[in-house]
Amino acid sequence: MKKFVALLISIVTVLTLAACGKKNNSEIDWTKTSLKSSYTIGAVEGAPTLSLVNVADGGFTYTDNDKNVTTDVTVAADATAVVANLINGTYDMAILPINNAAEIYDNSGKHEFRLATVNVFGVLYMIGKEDIDENMNNLKGEVVYCVGFGGTPGLVLKHLLEKNGISYEVGDNATDKNKVYIYPVAGGPEVIQGLNGGATKFAVLGEPAVTQVSGKTGASVVLDFKKEWQKFHGANSTFTQAGLVVNVNKVNKKYVEALVGHLKGNKAYLYANTDKIPAKLTSMGSTGPISKLTYNETILDRCSSDCKTATSMRANIEAFLAANNVELPGGSFYCL
């Protein structure tokens, strides 16, 4: 819990600092932004890094008037580090949760951090030691561990419980059989300990961590959050979880357009090169379990990696943000 609170405070601090010196600068012409010799994209380990695999390790070079522009992909320790490094200029771009992207856009005041694409389309699952028949009412009286409670996983879990008319509290002691108790945890190791030790029977986390934790606990997927989301928002609704945020004061538009064109091939690359994924992740700096998994079609299906422009997904993005009580950003937020 202490780690979670510290992480939440860090994110709030970063966003507050970004708001200092607020001014309206939404009419940035990033077609005139100078072209650098290299750009860096940051991402937290997990599905965000998988969405960049075909760019990593020299996978993408942009050429303009005989100038070669390289692209580096690097893994950050946690979501706070990704946000901080984007704001302080260490990263030129980053894969961020959509809700974080909207908050940074509004809080910066300069509106230079804009969404180019959506790359992760729902990787959240509930795993369990027993089945719930895809009915969240069967979680009443249970403790559910949640990785990323202060971010998208927690927002979506609470939203879906509310949509199902289920009361919840934050804590690890289930005293009311009519409530669900959500317990924030830092990551996979705590989930493994909780499931194996009997402290919980259920946990919310994202793929590919789902595969890694399931293999060490005997748990299985009992609820697909993407499907549960569609029950309340329509069968054609799209779960827009994370996307590419660009600092348009630092990155040239033509370069980003070329990069996005390349990223649209990432999904096909993943399925055609499952054996190369671990090495690609390692080249980004990944040292966690996801760089050691044996990837297959089932895992990739659950990772929901793709690349669609932000403008084409605007209606879905705004529905996702509104459902999670995040203030909708202005039109210039959608830069491609």
Residue ranges and their predicted role:
Residues 98-100, 179, 183-278:
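Pocket-lining segment of extracytoplasmic ligand-binding domains
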Residues 57, 87-88, 106-109, 131, ...:
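Sec-exported extracytoplasmic/periplasmic mature domains
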Residues 16-19:
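C-terminal motif of bacterial Sec signal peptides marking the signal peptidase cleavage site
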Residues 21-23:
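Bacterial signal peptide processing site
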Residues 2-10:
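Sec-dependent signal peptide recognition
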Residues 317-336:
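Conserved C-terminal helix/tail region of periplasmic/extracytoplasmic solute-binding proteins
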Residues 249-323:
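Secondary-structure end/capping motifs
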Residues 25-183, 201, 207, 222:
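Short, glycine-/small- and polar/acidic-enriched structural segments
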